[in-house]
Amino acid sequence: MTEQTPARQASHANRATRAEIWRLIKPFWVSEERWKAWALLLAILALNLGMVYINVRLNSWNRDMYNVLQSRDYPQFKSLLWQFSGLAFVFVAIAIYSVYLKQALQIRWRYWMSTRYLDRWLAHRAYYRIEQGQEGRLSDNPDQRIAEDLHALTSDTLSLVLGFISSSVTLFSFIHILWSVSGPLSFTALGQSWVIPGYMVWFVIAYAAIGSGVVWWIGRPLVGLSFNQERFEANFRFGLIRVREHAEAVALYRGEPQERAQLTARLDDIRENWWNIMRLTKKLNVAVNFYGQFAVIFPMLVSAPRYFSGAISLGVLMQISDAFGQVQDALSWFINAFTTLASWKASINRLAGFHADVERAAGMPRTLAVTQHGGSAVTLEGVQLSFPDGSLMLRRLDARVESGEHVLISGPSGCGKSTLIRAMADIWPYGEGRIALPQDAPAMFLPQRSYLPIGTLRAALSYPAAEGSFEDALITRYLGLCRLAHLASRLDVAANWSQALSPGEQQRLAFVRVFLNRPRLVFLDEASSAMDGETEEALYAALPRELPGVTVISIAHRETLARFHDVRWKFVPPAAGEGAGHRVEALPIAV
């Protein structure tokens, strides 16, 4: 989870084009899931059409029932009750299975999209490059995009599409009923006689058009406000998680007042934006509720003269009222769905930005090539490293590390030592040159702070291999070697091990991983900085003993570790007149 850069993202809030929307929605419907997806969709549409048909039947039933009540025809009244029971039973069954199949289609779509987005986010280390390229990002919090926005996209898209289709079918089913039963409207104006056939149809169209226009005019800022609300909520949640992750450091620094101030500032953003949403929603609700309530009485007001003149019966009056309501509700799809549309559009915008970030990260031009070759040495040819802004960090480096050789990288803090390790791990794209690693030599990279997945200790020790890949006896042996024997009885205990273990224990656990996975190349980026000197030296001495022929490239500041290495790569600051960028001197280490 990361905090966003608001200026660029806010400008992207309303930019999702129809092409981007189609690019987000289309893939699932042409994928290997398409047959099941289309079958479910067609089944849902068929059920929805069935509900429209039942509503048409109920419209006629409504007319007959009020006519029966007006004529006090008790036998026909009982017959209509039985008829209603059958229609109601079928309607309820259709409604239940329509929702059930819609939920089934939704989870299929969401699961398919989530797995594809996870693949894209994790492929080519896009997740890492997105975090590194903060200034050019269009989206924030990839976890929220995948977990929440994909859910909203699938749910809202189905609701909107199915609702629109049902409204369209309802409109065409009832508009001819309304036309036929409303009859003509005759009046005199401007000295002429006028006749409007099916006048209720024109009234309902005008009524819905005016209402939709008013709602759109009032509610159009809601998309941007919804976008910002999600952003502010994510930033607040991110701040809370940061306090949890660094609870010990915050406590030691007595940083509670500062953390509270920062969290309160983010909470203030949520409150201010929420008040804006409340004010806009209040105006929107005034228009929507006035529109909806007046629609109840409007058809009766317009039809009442014909009823009181005896031109139509009570049943026809109620049929007109019901048909008017059905047509008005169908034409009001935009009004009824406006809040969902605003939320859907905000989700589309965020996903479009996230999609663009992933594509840009995956397609980032690579002038620094990391390849594999059939030899046994690690070679660096013309390697230059840069900062993301293009300024030079490391000047040309040509070097070769033979199989079994141990290299110590040293130099002042911030000179690019860790970046060189990242470049060899193929996660730093800024630079040029060529790095070649042995093809048949699996590698492991140990950062200063190791990643410990939440779960059992066995899973944390086995990572990145699957849990259960190693026998207990082997795990226990290496726990003892790394001075973690006290953890041997807790292999199946699930915990947040990054919180349960001290920094030194976490680094020793990372060495257990190395011994278990037995790589041929080991890169250590201050991977023992939290250990005591005796333990650190014991583990460095164990590397060639437990992994004969292993190649080690490590960064360390303690000179006591030099004796475990063959060569030193010393980062030297540029001399006067040399320009920016450190250079590397390769120096043999006398044993």
Each language-model region and where it sits:
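Membrane-integrated ABC transporters
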Residues: 1-55, 60, 64-84, 98, ...
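Intrinsically disordered cytosolic tails
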Residues: 5-30, 43, 47, 52, ...
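Short intracellular "coupling" helices and adjacent cytoplasmic loop segments at the cytosolic face
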Residues: 6-11, 72-75, 104-107, 117-144, ...
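A hydrophobic transmembrane-helix motif
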Residues: 43-46, 50, 59, 94, ...
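Juxtamembrane helix-loop junctions of ABC transporter transmembrane domains
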Residues: 54-63, 67-70, 91-129, 158-162, ...
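Cytosolic ends of transmembrane helices, especially the final helix of ABC transmembrane type-1 domains
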Residues: 219, 223, 234, 238, ...
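ABC-type nucleotide-binding domain
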Residues: 371-591
